[in-house]
C-alpha cells in the first residue's frame, strides 16, 4: 500500500442478476470505462430460476480484462477491486475441485418445494425466532432455504459438507474464492445478513438457525466488514470491498446517516433506509438488515423489496408486445392525462414488502371500453411508484423518521414521468444523482477507503452531485384518492394462488 499514490484507479465488479459488469473509476470518482456481459438464465421449472456459477465467474473475469484493455490500463495501475453482487443467490461448490455441485439458486427463485420449507418453518413455530434473530421474514427469497434445498436434494451433499468437502457462499464468496485461487472463503456482514443463518445482533452465524435448517457450520464462510483487504487476486490487485448490491447503492448515494433512504429501480425495486447503529424491529413487513457505516463498519437499515419493478416494463415489451423498447413508456404515458382509472398490480411472482404474499398474482383493474394501450402503459409505470410508497410508508412508521428526500438510482430513473409521479404519490422530493452507477460506486468507495485511495467520507461526499430534483405537484386529496385505488386493487390480488398442500 506504500505505492498507493501511483495507482490511480479502482475497479468495481458489479455481478448482477442478468449480467456481469466491470466499472473503472478514477480518483475523482468518474467512470473511466465499463464492460458488460450478459449470461444465461435457466428456468428448469415454473417458478425456478438458476444460474451457472462457472458462467458467472467466466463473464465476471472477462469483463474485468475487457475494461482494462478498453481503458488502455494495466492491472498494476489498479489500487484495489471492490465487489458488489446480487444477494441471496446461493452457490455450493467442491472445496478441492472448485466445481459447483448444483446451479446457483437465484434470489428470484420461488420453487414450490422451497415454499413448503417455509410453510414447515412456520408450522414448527420458528417464524418469530427467525425475525428476531436475522431480521428477515420466513420467505423463499433468502439463502437459507435455498441452501437447505440443495443439501436435501443433491445426494450425499450434507454429509460431504459436514466432512469439510463442500463450501457455501453467496455470489461474493464464490467470486473471491475463485479470484484468490481458493485461498479465501469470506463474505461480508451485508451479504451474511441475507442468508437467514446470521444473527444480526451478535454478528455471528446463529447455531439455532443452522440446526433448524440442518446446515453444517463447516461449509460457511468467515464474515468480515465490507471495507478491508480480504486477499490478493490472481492479477495482484487486492480485493478490498464486498457489499450486497443494495447496501452498496445506499453507500454510493452517501446515505450513511440515520433517516436517509434510497430506492434502486431495477428488475425489482429495493428501498433501504439507514437507521444508524440501531436495529429497528419492523412491525410493518420490513426487513431489518445490515448496511455499511461511514467506513464500511456495521450499520443497520430497514429494507423493503418490490419483486416486480422494471420487469413490469419488460412484460409490456416481451409478452404483451405493446412497446418496442422500455424507453417508449415515458412517451406513451405522457400522451394521456391519467390512467383512466386503470390499476396494474404486477404480482407476477407474488408480492414482496410489506405484504410478503407468495400466493398473490398479477391483475389489471378498472378496464372499460375507454381504456387504451396508453392507459395500461401508464398504469404499469404508476405501479412501480405505488409499490415504492407501500414500502416507504411502512418504513417511516417503523423508524419514526419522516423522509425529507428520496435518493434514486437504477435504470428506470431516466424515465422523467416515473420520477415525477414518484414524487407526486409520495409527497416527497425525489433526488436523481448525476452519477447513475451508484451500486458500483459504493463498492469502489468502500474499496478505496480500505486501501487509502480515498482518505475520508467527507472527501467522498464532495463528489456527490444531484442532477435533478423532482418536487411533488399533486395536492393531498388527489394523491390520497389515487393511492386508495391502488390499495383496493392490491387487496383483490392477495392469496390468489392455492397454497402448497392445500386441498
Swiss-Prot record:
Going by the UniProt record, its keywords in alphabetical order are: ATP-binding, Glycerol metabolism, Kinase, Nucleotide-binding, Transferase
Do you know which Pfam families this protein is assigned to? FGGY_C, FGGY_N
Which reaction is this enzyme known to catalyze? glycerol + ATP = sn-glycerol 3-phosphate + ADP + H(+)
Q: Which residues bind glycerol?
A: 87-88, 141, 245-246
PROSITE patterns membership: FGGY_KINASES_1, FGGY_KINASES_2
* Alphabetized Gene3D superfamilies for the sequence: 3.30.420.40
Residues annotated as binding ADP:
17, 21, 267, 310, 411, 415
Q: In which pathway does it act?
A: Polyol metabolism; glycerol degradation via glycerol kinase pathway; sn-glycerol 3-phosphate from glycerol: step 1/1
Determine if Transit peptide is one of this entry's keywords. Answer: no
Q: Which GO cellular component terms are attached?
A: cytosol
One Gene Ontology term of the biological-process aspect is: glycerol catabolic process
Task: Give this protein's Gene Ontology molecular function annotations.
Answer: ATP binding; glycerol kinase activity
Which parts of the sequence bind ATP?
17-19, 267, 310, 314, 411
Q: Which domain of life is it from?
A: Bacteria
Q: Which residues bind sn-glycerol 3-phosphate?
A: 17, 87-88, 141, 245
Q: What EC number(s) does its UniProt record assign?
A: 2.7.1.30
* Top enzyme class: transferase
Supply the InterPro entries for this chain.
ATPase_NBD, Carb_kinase_FGGY, Carb_kinase_FGGY_CS, FGGY_C, FGGY_N, Glycerol_kin
Activity-regulation annotation: Inhibited by fructose 1,6-bisphosphate (FBP).
Give the family this protein belongs to, as stated in its UniProt record.
Answer: Belongs to the FGGY kinase family.
Q: What's this protein's function?
A: Key enzyme in the regulation of glycerol uptake and metabolism. Catalyzes the phosphorylation of glycerol to yield sn-glycerol 3-phosphate.
Q: Which PANTHER family match?
A: GLYCEROL KINASE (PTHR10196:SF69), SUGAR KINASE (PTHR10196)
Protein name in the entry: Glycerol kinase
**Annotated gene:** glpK
